[in-house]
Amino acid sequence: MNDSELTQFVTQLLWIVLFTSMPVVLVASVVGVIVSLVQALTQIQDQTLQFMIKLLAIAITLMVSYPWLSGILLNYTRQIMLRIGEHG
């Protein structure tokens, strides 16, 4: 495996990390803003409420997006293993 192939795989890995982390980050951000807005409007200043709602939203997002995430990661792993096997 030469340097250009290695650079290509690392670049592809960084894009995969970006795309697979994006759903969780977006959901956490949106839920955080909404909960903060509701807390400001109702003058409830309990931090555990925000934490628990975010945690629940992230868990649901991970459960829903798990097939997509695992498919992407498994395809990348297969691709890497095949390339390593070719150069054995």
UniProtKB/Swiss-Prot annotation:
Gene Ontology CC annotations of this record: plasma membrane
Protein name as catalogued: Secretion system apparatus protein SsaS
One of the GO biological process terms: protein secretion
Protein purpose: Part of a type III secretion system.
Residues passing through the membrane, by range: 15-35, 55-75
Entry's localization field: Cell membrane
Entries under Pfam families matching the protein: Bac_export_3
Topology within the bilayer: Multi-pass membrane protein
Main localisation: membrane
Source taxonomy: Bacteria, Pseudomonadati, Pseudomonadota, Gammaproteobacteria, Enterobacterales
Signal peptide: none
Keywords: Cell membrane, Membrane, Protein transport, Transmembrane, Transmembrane helix, Transport
Family listed: Belongs to the FliQ/MopD/SpaQ family.
InterPro entries: Bac_export_3 (IPR002191), T3SS_HrpO (IPR006306)
Keyword Transmembrane recorded: yes
Keyword match Transcription regulation: no
